[in-house]
Amino acid sequence: MKRLCCFALSLLPLSAFAYPIEVEPQLNGSEVSYSTQDIGRDMGAILLTNLGSQAAECTAVFRNGPETPKVRKGVIQPGQNSNFTAQFGRDIIKLRIKLTCKIAK
């Protein structure tokens, strides 16, 4: 019985699918808030909300280890949301997102 309990406890880490997401924001005067999401074991997302009174141009660069970075761009109107997603060929261990926003002209 003791061995069965130890075996069951050893499987618990395998059930965790969450991974850390690190965001490096560079907002440059735009009023954009963000929240991250882990969608699956090989897919991540960032939800952007424009809280300002002017449109914002945003670029998100998703990095997962040695894979090629995925770049997502968009213009977010005032009071609107935008969801940027990226899917990778490998499981994500730690996702790094470089977020750059500026006021649209």
Labelled PLM ranges:
Residues 25, 85-105:
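Terminal connector regions
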Residues 48-54:
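Asparagine-centered strand-capping/turn motif at beta-strand->loop junctions
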Residues 4-14:
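Sec-dependent N-terminal signal peptides
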Residues 65-92:
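Intrinsically disordered, low-complexity Pro/Gly/Ser/Thr-rich segments with frequent PxxP/GP/PP motifs
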Residues 16-38:
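Transition segment at domain starts
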Residues 3-4, 56, 99:
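Secreted/extracellular small peptides and ectodomain modules produced from precursors
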Residues 55-61:
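Short, hydrophobic/aromatic beta-strand segments
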Residues 42-46:
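Structural beta-strand segments of beta-rich domains
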